[in-house]
Amino acid sequence: MILQPSALLCLSSLWGVIVQASQGQFPVTQNVTVVEGGTINLTCRVDQNDNTSLQWSNPAQQTLYFDDKKALRDNRIELVRASWHELSISISDVSLSDEGQYTCSLFTMPVKTSKAYLMVLGVPENPHISGFTSPVMEGDTIQLTCKSSGSKPAADIRWFKNDQEITDVQKIQQQDSNGKTFTVTSSLVFQGDRKDDGAVIRCRVDHESLTSTPQIAKQVLEIHYTPTVRILPSTPLPQEGQPLILICESKGKPLPEPVLWTKDGGELPDPERMTVNGRELTISFLNKTDNGTYRCEATNSIGQSSAEYVLIINDVPKPLFPTTIIPLFTSATVKTNVAMSTRTTKSAFITKDPNALPGPVATDHALIGGVVAVVVFVTLCSIILIGRYLARHKGTYLTNEAKGAEDAPDADTAIINAEGSQVNAEEKKEYFI
């Protein structure tokens, strides 16, 4: 029997419709993950359905919903949507026992199914740190253990000291008796050090179920240690006649008791000048007898420590030149001398020795040079004035003994500038002696 081409075309079209219909009548589901105690939706969709029923069943093959009819009496299971193309249900307060494969069935001939795996995350319990007994002595071994149970999958534990992560740790995980969750334990071992006193050790649990903030346990370290001592002087160069304060700075835990001050291995020799106030030693007036070694000793319940300070008193520095100035001239003369001193000083700076040492010595030399210049100037002025005075009063002077002389012009007068050969004498002046 030979089929006509038209019949073949009809059979081909019918087969395509059947295949397409069979592909559109296949249920589609998705795997879901939920945190223990949460709510989840299970959805089954069919693109093309010829009024065929849909059904959801749990891992125990118990029917939950058949179309819109509830089959299992469980108040946690509710219908979300039911149609020929979709069947959606919700499960609230999910527990670990709800985990498994859920099946959506499409009742065609034969029945078509699709499976969705429900994964339930176990939330880890709050961590707890054990193994620390306060206080710990410096140098002792400290072992801290952080433990958290109920996580699924197993949680991760991380250690931090203040804000710095510690990676040298040991981790152990064990499965709980329910066969689903895990208990995670991590240990941290280190030596107690004074710098760790007051430090905060944090144990943090990281898990995919903790979407907001991680769970953290804290432990504050308390380390006891012997005191550390140092002495701080109030001045780096103590001088004779000045006061001095020595501060004894001590740190320790527990806090050190009041410090003890000694000098050269004995008590303080002069309690009137040397007073102790708390951690400070005050010497009101230094003298050479105070030289020596001062010791500050601090003690607590752990031990004792001390520091020493060697006191060497320096002499008070003396000025290189006296600073007293004796006034020699009147105010008018001082004005003139100051001007001359300025000019002389300027000249001295121009011609000063280039090898001269800088500083106060050069300044004193300039001052002395100015004073010498003023003295020389005044001396020269005095010589000039005296010379002019003598030149103007040159002549012959008669005394009382010459009154009886015959050649005396006048016994009561003295003639100045009256030489016998001078005919054109301009002026004669007489003075009584």
From Swiss-Prot:
Highest taxon of the lineage: Eukaryota
Record domain Ig-like V-type: where: 27-114
The keyword Repeat appears for this protein: yes
Domain (Ig-like C2-type) ranges: 127-217, 227-312
Lineage of the species this protein comes from: Eukaryota, Metazoa, Chordata, Craniata, Vertebrata
Protein name: Cell adhesion molecule 2
CDD domains named in the record: IgI_2_Necl-3, IgV_1_Necl-3
GO cellular component: membrane
Topology relative to the membrane: Single-pass type I membrane protein
Family named by the database record: Belongs to the nectin family.
Segment forming the signal sequence: 1-24
Annotated localization: Membrane
Gene3D superfamilies (UniProt xref): Immunoglobulins (2.60.40.10)
A family per Pfam: C2-set_2
TM annotation in the entry: 366-386
